[in-house]
Amino acid sequence: MAESGVPVLGFFIIAVLMSAQESWAIKEEHVIIQAEFYLNPDQSGEFMFDFDGDEIFHVDMAKKETVWRLEEFGRFASFEAQGALANIAVDKANLEIMTKRSNNTPITNVPPEVTVLTNSPVELGEPNVLICFIDKFSPPVVKVTWLKNGKPVTTGVSETVFLPREDHLFRKFHYLPFLPSTEDIYDCKVEHWCLDAPLLKHWEFDAPSPLPETTENVVCALGLIVGLVGIIVGTVFIIKGVRKSNAAERRGPL
């Protein structure tokens, strides 16, 4: 996907819920972001709402419906998908105008940073989830492929939409359920316009290293010494106690 950059139109409308003013200073408590963009030549777009860095919902452009990040959200609120489709149509028209005015000048591409981690501490044979976190990139176009032992995996994979950052870059999460094993290795393969070659982030089970023999010997020796000291100290106290008792018996009652 090493292609030259193309213009991307991104509109970001930010609504901030703020605390009370203190000495004319305003502190943000929560932030809601409405993010939308239209992309050429892909002819794709996105419309979503974000609350404090977490997606609330996005609009599926193909199905023309609102998709809530959590089903429960849709029980307390509603959003008409047609409104988002109308916004994207405006974005497309504005993009065409800006492209002509800029003489087809491409935007500046920013390569992604990629991290692979697990959802929870790894235990062999216990189900877990691999997370591929793609961060700080622009434009919002990436192709992500999970590899298991070098072969593509598609079963059970899922992903988020493109999530906005306050610096107008993007982030995205991809997920792969898996069963940890010492025999399997995984890679998250990321392709982006700004990369000359696909970026691979590797993950495999890393068994805890056993203690060296010298360390084990030292630990055993320390344990033995502590045990002997405890026995000696205990014996001393017992002897002192017996001597005091005998001395008291010899003196007899006053």
UniProtKB/Swiss-Prot annotation:
* Residue numbers spanned by region Alpha-2: 110-203
Which residues have a glycan attached per UniProt?
103
PROSITE patterns per the record? IG_LIKE, IG_MHC
Signal peptide residues are 1-25
GO biological processes: adaptive immune response; antigen processing and presentation of exogenous peptide antigen via MHC class II; peptide antigen assembly with MHC class II protein complex; positive regulation of immune response; positive regulation of T cell activation
A Pfam family it matches: C1-set
- Give the residue ranges for region: Connecting peptide: 204-216
* Gene Ontology cellular component annotations, sorted alphabetically: late endosome membrane; lysosomal membrane; MHC class II protein complex
> Which segments does the topology annotation call Cytoplasmic?
240-254
What are the start and end residues of every segment in region (Alpha-1)?
26-109
GO terms for MF: MHC class II protein complex binding; peptide antigen binding
Membrane topology of this protein:
Single-pass type I membrane protein
Give residue ranges on the Extracellular side.
Answer: 26-216
| UniProt entry keywords in alphabetical sequence | Adaptive immunity, Disulfide bond, Glycoprotein, Immunity, Isopeptide bond, Membrane, MHC II, Signal, Transmembrane, Transmembrane helix, Ubl conjugation
Q: Which cysteines are joined by disulfide bonds?
A: 132-188
State the family named in the UniProt similarity comment for this chain. Belongs to the MHC class II family.
Subunit structure, interactors included: Heterodimer of an alpha chain and a beta chain.
Protein's recorded name = Mamu class II histocompatibility antigen, DR alpha chain
Identify the gene encoding this protein: Mamu-DRA
